[in-house]
Amino acid sequence: MGLLVLKRLMSVQQERRHIQARNFFIASVAKRKGSVCLQLANSEGGKIMGYSGLNLPEDIWSHIHSLMPLRDAARAACVSRAFRSFWRYHPNLIFRIETPDLNFIKKVDCILKNHSGIGIKSLRFESGIFYNASTSYYLDSWLQIAVTPSIEELTLGILSYNTNYFDSKYDDEYNFPCSLLSDGRGSSMRHLYLSRCSFHPTINLELRNLTRLHLAFVHITGNELGCVLSNSYALERLELNYCYGIICVKIPCLLQRLSHLEVFECRMLQVIENSAPNLGSFHFGINHVQLLLGESLQMKSLSMCYPGAVYYACAELPSNVPNLETLTIGSPHEMVDTPMLPSKFLHLKCLTISLVGMVTFSPAYDYFSLVSFLDASPSLETFFLDVSQERMGHVSIFGDSLQLRQMPEHHRHGNLQSVKITGFCSAKSLIELTCYILDNTTSLKCLTLDTTRGVSSCSTGEHKKCFPIGKMLTEANRAVLAIETFIERKVPSTVKLAVTKPCSRCHVKS
């Protein structure tokens, strides 16, 4: 990136110097063992740095230095007095290490204490920091240096020795100093990511340019979250994962730019109320939560994952999100079959349903009842169904092959082109669903039936062995026989049938 910027900056110079500079930097990068800048000459007191006829102002060299990766920038500062002064103003501080330890903390502390604090745009701890009483002092000190009116991105990942993230005791958590984001210091912040800490703003934070807020394993209340959102007018993405303490999430109407909302496993959460008018995608995975979506006319994409999600989607969504185009549903358990829908998903084009339990999906659930979902989606083009399980408990087609059911009223599907079923088994109701699709879809181009779990396969060349399918091997072979017996004869010549069978090399019974 620094090379490209340098080329642009030098475009006004003569062609000869441009070529020399480009070749110099390419050679320098190719020979790099310690730093891309080992060959750069030191500045000897002037405001011009030179190399082989390359004359650039000091501010351009400073800009080049700012575009280097943090490791290279630090090494350049070690061998060049000029770059050493630039190092104190390096804008992007990104720290990552596989095993953070005390030595890592000392290095970070040294780097930040030697930084001027001026011009920092990004501070990211991507690998996380183990938190204890002693590291609290360091974190406070580092944030005090880095969080200035110029900072645009802050990523603070904390690793806790306590694995019970839903404990009611928060004494051993790092308490993020919210005052650092007041008095204009957070005015340029665009992306804030906090994990495994407490975040308790008691005053309105000045985050008028914040576009993305991501909180994971953070202790914060609904009122405190509202305090953050009330001044985040530019917010576009809000992600709340495993945040304990929130009972109600209220999205105010002033968030005109909010287009993406994600809420997963916030266990105390009871209500999600949205008033943002332009919310386009919503992804959530919480059980027994009341959704007040308002007039979500702009919502095009929705995903949900919790027990009973299929039933809820059929009963509530068509009227609440009428313009939905992509719907993803995950449910480990359904108490009842899929009901007839009260109204239609007129614009739904892509439907993904995952009915995957811990061991086996409820044997009482009728896969054939999903027909009502398909019939309520006249614009549907793609349908993915995952029914992978450890043990098949449904009635097999070979145990009851008489009189396959058909719907009394035929709905012709003229837009559905691709259907894929992963974890395909010999369950009679699943065979009936597949036959219904073949009999009533005039536009179908591809039908994929995967009798494995749809995971790694040696046939792709990327893996040496296929992912084991364990006790489902016998059932997978039965599924192949069911396809050959009941489905292949129904496939029109215009439809491509792709069947993924157990691997003859990897999936062999011992």
What spans do the regions from the language model cover?
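Leucine-rich repeat domain C-terminal region
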Residues: 291-306, 414, 423, 440-444, ...
